[in-house]
UniProtKB/Swiss-Prot annotation:
GO terms for biological process: defense response to virus. It comes from Methanocaldococcus jannaschii (strain ATCC 43067 / DSM 2661 / JAL-1 / JCM 10045 / NBRC 100440) (Methanococcus jannaschii). This is CRISPR-associated protein Cas8a2/Csa4. It holds the Pfam family Cas_Csa4. Keywords: Antiviral defense.
Amino acid sequence: MIIKGLRVEKEKLQSLQKFWRLRVMLFETPGYNEILDLYIAYGVVECLVREGVENLRFFPIGNKYCIVVEEPTNVNIKNRIEKGMLNALEDMLSLHKAIGKYISTKEDIKIISDVDFSAGANINNVYWDGIPKTLEKIKENIKKGKLSTKSKNTVPLTLMPAAGKYMPKIYGVKGGNPIKIDDSNYALAWIGFHYYAPYINISDNRATYIHIYAIKPLEELGLIEILALKDLKKKINNYQLGKYKFFVNKKLALLYHLTHTESISALEIVTKKNFSVVSYTLENVDNNQAIRSFGEYDLSKLMDFLWYLKATDFYNTIQFVDNILRGDLEVSLTFIDGILYDDLDAVYSAIRKLKSVRISPLIIQSILEWFGNFY
């Protein structure tokens, strides 16, 4: 089967009695690593959705993730996943080829683009052409019905930051040697990352920083919540470091991203559920690569804050956040930490330091009302 550990357990099915007229399938991720498993799970969901599956639920269980699918008994779920995988890979690789730069070498022609599975979200330039070629081979093997079950594909830091010697111990995550996984899980992980994992690539002449945000559900999600998460992901997120220094900080970069990409309707849907975000930054300075930051914080709170303000005054919310971010870095950090840790005094202090900036009274009122919900 596509995912190791596929099983239907009697005790779990008992809680799904009302669906017994349907075929109930429980998919469990392999258990490689919390982040890698999350991307694999999102990949499974994307493949199923592309094949018209609507009755599915997605939830965490320990460091793994489960997808429950309820479909008529005559539906072959395995075939649907493979067809969805083929469809997703075709779309991803078509985008890569359409916007990519073609480079002739002695061996062949390399294609490098700003999509996430090429140069967009990979710090190591070996992967810029290598990953797309691997996904191309997997796509052709799906067509032939010859998916390899051998664990031969190296997982890059982008998909699993703990799988590499560049993970410092100070972040509380033990680094290790890169692991290898089979074709199906490799493709599923990249599909999940491509459609559900926001990232921001910032660079200048000597440095590149790639902030990656793995969105973790802390409770069960239905199809509507899952699809709303896709609004978080823009396909290309590249910025010049020289213009916006705040992008170096992963929390401030996320605040900017959410402010400028997330719709009010999607924010409203997502804030009804509990999520956390595991953020990590891949850094390349003067050809030295490393993971410089790794952390987890409450995404739901940040999104709820933005939804509350945007619902009141959409335009001025964007202007207000931009003014905060483009000011003093210490002020910006004080502001976002005040939101994440329910500290109204910190937010007020940051706002007071915005000298010569006119702030809409509606924004101030909305901030006070939002904090009032916690007291």
